[in-house]
């Protein structure tokens, strides 16, 4: 399956033991053509409901309805690659405001400017 950048998808965690996984949301960060098709993988960021966090980079998701989430959640810059075929389903997409904020956070934390 091909997923667009900033789609929210459901993936199995952890990836190391296929017999003991839980389904968790994640945000697709990679370009579907330049990275996804070429490598068969997607670069993603974790989505969490953890409100008490020591991660200063946690970004609240404002538009939870478009994202397909059922309650308050945060994008956590805990990044990982996952094979395309392990993605269970697409659940939604970040809203435009959330996309702008996430792009700014990535630029800030990875000194991309």
Task: Identify the role of each PLM range.
Residues 19-23, 28-60:
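Compact nucleic-acid interaction/catalytic patches
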């Amino acid at each position: 399956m091909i997923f667009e950048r900033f789609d929210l998808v459901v993936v199995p965690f952890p990836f190391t033991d296929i017999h003991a996984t839980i389904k968790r949301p994640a945000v697709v960060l990679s370009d579907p053509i330049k990275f996804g098709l070429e490598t068969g993988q997607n670069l993603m960021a974790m989505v969490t409901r953890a409100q008490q966090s020591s991660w200063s980079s946690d970004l609240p998701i404002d538009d939870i309805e478009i994202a397909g989430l059922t309650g308050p959640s945060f994008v956590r810059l805990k990044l990982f690659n996952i094979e395309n075929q392990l993605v269970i389903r697409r659940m939604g997409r970040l809203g435009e405001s959330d996309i702008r904020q996430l792009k700014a956070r990535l630029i800030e934390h990875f000194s991309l400017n």
